[in-house]
Amino acid sequence: MTEFFSGNRGEWSEPYALFKLLADGQLYLGDSQLNKLGIVMPILSILRQEKNYESSYILHNNSQNIIVTYNNEKFTVPISGFQEKAVLLLSEIKNASGNRAFSIPSIDDFLKKLGFTHLSASSSSKSDIHIVVHDLRTGITPTLGFSIKSQLGSPATLLNASKATNFTFKIYNLKDKQIEYINSLSGIKEKIKEIFSQDGKLEFVKVESCKFSNNLTLIDTKLPEILAEMILLYYSSKLNKIDDVTEHISRLNPLNYNLSCNHNYYEYKVKHFLNDVALGMRPDDVWLGQYDATGGYLVVKEDGELLCYHIYSKNSFEDYLYCNTKFDTPSSSRHDFGHIYQVNHDFFIKLNVQIRFL
């Protein structure tokens, strides 16, 4: 019995992106609102890692063929073939629903001919494909790694939640009976709002994980406090978009920065944080400030068009992350947070968030 490749909409978006790139022959840079900037980088070749070997796709001058090499195999495929398969893939992805896995038998032989061993890259890597481009502004031909983010599937996660991303807060001004009642409430946001409605106070104590705390401090010494303020605002209000939460915190200015000259302290630091998460920083690992081998993100838009965001255009990349992400509440039981607990005579609560794309 023949086994077909199977994946959800996000996983199928990876071969779609490859075929679309080979058909277009160039990368389009995008702005924060997912519009083309008018800056184009011609593609020279694309590299994709399979299980035991690397496949390369070379766009040769003005040829209408792509040179494909992998595992001692070398052959050409007409660009029109990638165009046709990209159209087919996009239609099948759009017709799928939910996050279920599905197969596309009509494209299976083409994938196997190209040496595909899987649809999507390993989750341990931040880069899904590597692209050699001709940067017309500098004249150089760098190899850039890209993570593919698809709007055709479920929203991707930028910062994954874990116990390492718990933030601990101390509770003041509440009596035992009040604590008991608040703990009986089911929703975490409901608990936080009730703490404040009963004149309670929450004070940030620490980031639960020493590694994550140090990673944040490496980015900016005040970043743990800034994120703690943002997390509190998220759980005590209807705000969830990163840019909205940051702007609100900026107006409150809880860290008492000197704003007399209109410096965007909070926005600058949050953008730096998002950039570093996107390019290598993981909460569970010691991070030394070195970016992963990635150039940035390739975004598959809902209409199938591709936009590129990379560290060569750092401002556009950070603006994209800032304007297209939001806080989300992860599983409290899995990550052990959202319950008031007592240590000696003091009460504490841990709060946790993950950051998703819109």
UniProtKB/Swiss-Prot annotation:
InterPro entries: Restrct_endonuc_II_HpaII. Transmembrane segments: none annotated. Its EC number is 3.1.21.4. Pfam families: RE_HpaII. Keywords: Endonuclease, Hydrolase, Nuclease, Restriction system. GO terms for biological process: DNA restriction-modification system. It catalyses: Endonucleolytic cleavage of DNA to give specific double-stranded fragments with terminal 5'-phosphates. GO terms for molecular function: type II site-specific deoxyribonuclease activity. Homodimer. This is Type II restriction enzyme HpaII. The gene is hpaIIR.
